[in-house]
Amino acid sequence: MKNTVIRGTAASNQIRVFVANTTEMVAKAQELQMATPVAIAALGRTLTATSMMGLMSKSEKEKITVNINGGGPLGPIVVVGNSKGIVKGYVSHPHVEGSNLYPGKLDVGSAVGTDGTITVVKDLGLKEPYIGTYPLSTGEIAEDFAAYFAFSEQQPSGIALGVLVDVDYTIKAAGGYIIQVLPNIEEETLTKLESKLSTLEPITSIIDRIQDPEEILNHILGEFEPVILETYDVDFVCDCSEERLEQVLISIGEKELTEIIEEDKQAELVCHFCNKKYHFDEEHLNKLRSEILNKNNNI
């Protein structure tokens, strides 16, 4: 139940909603990235949002890449997701220490920064992917996704994302929701929804107390008679492999690869997403260089 997203509707199909509990997923990301509280708060929020966005896809082949770069000390945050809600991601500087806005509330906005953009790339496997970019509004992630949806996709959305880090730096709760109003929404329903969302306690408090996404949905939208359409198991999964890293080395070209062989006689590559190390000895590098030369000779 700790890595679950539910998709549903409410108010007789006037509202679309996604609710996520991603506590274990964010804990896994924290362990892989060895991230500080403020770093995992920023990354965890982005992972949760991207997972829910992936589940909005109408194509099973769609891949989503979210890049948040606000010019802050954390550096760019990159998350990649698919149509099943499976994600992987990293924060460029995971060891940055942050400050609190007030006791118990991390200042994620200052760590992310606001001098930059949120960019969403949706790759459907066609010739050109869809790319949407919008200036960051607060760096707090949820508001930035809401602004992206409103202006890049013309979809008004209420979004809450959160990561609750315990005193021992473990992840106590993580998750969020995306609530979107559909074109047929009545003014009275919209006013009632806005009022409800404005009075909710922080999403991490709700998840820490309730945990089950179905119960969270009823807590948030119970008066709108929500209907659950589907439940998804989501996760942080890195699909890196030696073969993929071989392609990275091949892509640098014969000249640079030869320089590495002559100067270092080995190479070590580290996956950004899971920090797994791949070691290539001189024999392996020479084999890759031969592949490049053979390919060039056949052109």
From Swiss-Prot:
PTM notes: Under oxidizing conditions two disulfide bonds are formed involving the reactive cysteines. Under reducing conditions zinc is bound to the reactive cysteines and the protein is inactive.
Cystine pairs: 238-240, 271-274
A GO biological process held by the record: protein refolding
Alphabetized InterPro entries for the sequence: Heat_shock_Hsp33, Heat_shock_Hsp33_C, Heat_shock_Hsp33_N
Keyword field contains Disulfide bond: yes
Keyword line: Chaperone, Cytoplasm, Disulfide bond, Redox-active center, Zinc
Superkingdom of origin organism: Bacteria
Listed GO MF terms: protein folding chaperone; unfolded protein binding
Pfam (any one): HSP33
Subcellular localization, as worded in the UniProt entry: Cytoplasm
A GO term from the CC aspect: cytoplasm
Main localisation: cytoplasm
Protein role: Redox regulated molecular chaperone. Protects both thermally unfolding and oxidatively damaged proteins from irreversible aggregation. Plays an important role in the bacterial defense system toward oxidative stress.
HAMAP family, A to Z: HslO (MF_00117)
Family of the protein in this entry: Belongs to the HSP33 family.
The protein's name in its UniProt record: 33 kDa chaperonin
Organism in which the protein naturally occurs: Alkaliphilus oremlandii (strain OhILAs) (Clostridium oremlandii (strain OhILAs))
Source lineage: Bacteria, Bacillati, Bacillota, Clostridia, Peptostreptococcales
